[in-house]
Curated annotation (Swiss-Prot):
NCBIfam families reported in the protein's UniProt record: rpsG_bact
Lineage of the species this protein comes from: Bacteria, Bacillati, Bacillota, Bacilli, Bacillales
Species of origin: Exiguobacterium sibiricum (strain DSM 17290 / CCUG 55495 / CIP 109462 / JCM 13490 / 255-15)
Sequence similarity: Belongs to the universal ribosomal protein uS7 family.
A Pfam family: Ribosomal_S7
Protein name: Small ribosomal subunit protein uS7
Biological process annotations from GO: translation
Gene designation: rpsG
Function: One of the primary rRNA binding proteins, it binds directly to 16S rRNA where it nucleates assembly of the head domain of the 30S subunit. Is located at the subunit interface close to the decoding center, probably blocks exit of the E-site tRNA.
Gene3D superfamilies: Ribosomal protein S7 domain
Keywords, sorted A to Z: Ribonucleoprotein, Ribosomal protein, RNA-binding, rRNA-binding, tRNA-binding
GO MF entry, a single one: rRNA binding
Keyword Hydrolase listed: no
Quaternary assembly: Part of the 30S ribosomal subunit. Contacts proteins S9 and S11.
GO CC annotation, single: small ribosomal subunit
Length: 156
């Protein structure tokens, strides 16, 4: 923990093409080894593929997918009297988007399509249709929170 108080959060610049901070954050999550240009190309190709296949605006599909991936509840480990309890807690809005982006990129990387832009496009489209691995991850988190609802009074 820093001694000089709370660290100020840096604001990301909005994406020049889609004019969205969420898109910039997705590009930053996609980026490997500082290669931002490559990450941008992957995302823009994926968005083109989404627009072509769905016949809708890619940003619309992406925002719908994000809403389907964002978790509302999660569990945190809390130690009480020598036992660890999985305590369900509500997820803050900023963390919701962070987790959703993380799940989207991680499960896109695990897919079997040939190129990363195809993987990302398919995962976004699956998420928009409430299917796909990233949506399943969210459902699993909610199931865990529901199963441990009895420990909700240990919340802090």
């Amino acid at each position: 923990m820093p001694r000089k108080g709370q660290v100020e959060r840096r604001d990301v610049m909005a994406d020049p093409i889609y004019n969205s901070k969420l898109v910039t954050r997705l590009i930053n999550r996609l980026m490997l080894d500082g290669k931002k240009g490559t990450a941008q190309q992957i995302l823009y190709k994926a968005f083109e593929a989404i627009a072509e296949r769905s016949g809708r605006d890619a940003m619309e599909v992406f925002e719908e997918a994000m809403n389907n991936i964002m978790p509302v509840l999660e569990v945190k480990a809390r130690r009480v009297g020598g036992a660890n309890y999985q305590v369900p807690v509500e997820v803050r809005p900023e963390r919701r988007t962070t987790l959703a982006l993380r799940y989207l990129v991680n499960y896109s990387r695990l897919r079997n399509e040939k190129t990363m832009d195809a993987r990302l496009a398919n995962e976004i489209m699956d998420a928009a249709n409430n299917t796909g691995a990233s949506v399943k991850k969210r459902e699993d988190m909610h199931k865990m929170a529901e199963a441990n609802k009895a420990f909700a009074h240990y919340r802090w």
